[in-house]
C-alpha cells in the first residue's frame, strides 16, 4: 500500500525515488487501495511498503490505520498490518506510541557512511539513533519489529556485515529480513548470490 505519490527519500536502490515527490495521499486514498480490490475480503495482511515514506505523511497514515483497526472500521487486528519506513525519528516515536501495528525499518547497511550513500535520510536520522530509540519500547510480545536488508553483491554481503548487524541490533527483540535486489536502470548495484545469503543467515542465527 502506498502513502504518497512519489517519494522525497531518494534511496539509491528504489525506482520511486527517481520519480521525485508529487503529493501526499489522504487517508481515504490509502484505504481505497485496499477497498477497491475485488479480493479485499480474502486479504490476510497489509504492508505499507508501496510508493512513498509513510512517516512523511504520518497524519493521514495514522487515520488510515485507525480506520483499518477500529471497531467502527474494518476491525482488523494490528497484527495484520506492517508499516515499513526509513525511520524518520520524530514520526517513528509517534507511530510506535499511537498504534500497535508491526514495524519494519529499512536498514540495508549497519555502517553509517555506507547507509548514507544508499539512503540519504541517514544523514538526518542515523540508524544508531533509531536503534537507541527503539530500545525504549517492548517488541517481545504481540508487536513485531523487523529490519529490512537488501543484499547487494560485493557491497554488504560479507560476514563482516553480519557481525556489524549483530553488534548494532544487540539488545533488540527483532528479526532481520534478507531481501533480494531487483535491478533498476541507471543504478550500479547488483543483487548478491545465494551463497552470500546463506553465509549471512548462518551468522544471524
Segments predicted by a language model, with ranges:
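Conserved small/polar residues in nucleotide/adenosyl-binding loops
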Residues: 198-205
